[in-house]
């Protein structure tokens, strides 16, 4: 690995640890030329399935879009970034585990609602109201009643 400070090609690994529930390796490295230290993270690059939208268009899976939707739902709620990242990891793992090359956007929405239900009930209702396009108060009541079961 090239040193980010002096661009030397020779660095040595000082320390390695598993992070992100064992899905990444954190390595502490030192340049043999300038002796600066830096951290790298290594993880498997896994291919996500393409997303089939409601209008039948297809697009690449966008993790930022998934994260943004979850962040909007949990905004100002007592949900830590670690909890949110774990939920995102579960969603992505479930999508990969289907083995499909393409998945419906509806499946992603349902997985997001499932994770939000476990994280925070208010965040779940927020997301469901937009995702399911609630039009009146009775639909909110039905969603809340479903949570109370």
UniProtKB/Swiss-Prot annotation:
Q: Which InterPro entries match?
A: ATP-cone_dom, NrdR-like_N, RNR_NrdR-like
Cofactor binding notes: Binds 1 zinc ion.
Annotated keywords: ATP-binding, DNA-binding, Metal-binding, Nucleotide-binding, Repressor, Transcription, Transcription regulation, Zinc, Zinc-finger
* Keyword Metal-binding found: yes
Q: Which terms does the record give in the GO molecular function aspect?
A: ATP binding; DNA binding; zinc ion binding
Using the record's annotation, list all stretches that form the ATP-cone domain. 49-139
List cofactor names only: Zn(2+)
Q: Which Pfam families match?
A: ATP-cone (PF03477), Zn_ribbon_NrdR (PF22811)
Q: Where are the zinc fingers (unnamed)?
A: 3-34
Protein's UniProt keywords contain Membrane: no
Q: Name one GO biological process term.
A: negative regulation of DNA-templated transcription
Q: Which family does it belong to?
A: Belongs to the NrdR family.
NCBIfam families per the UniProt record, alphabetical? transcriptional regulator NrdR
Q: What does this protein do?
A: Negatively regulates transcription of bacterial ribonucleotide reductase nrd genes and operons by binding to NrdR-boxes.
Q: What is this protein called?
A: Transcriptional repressor NrdR
- Lineage, please? Bacteria, Pseudomonadati, Pseudomonadota, Gammaproteobacteria, Alteromonadales
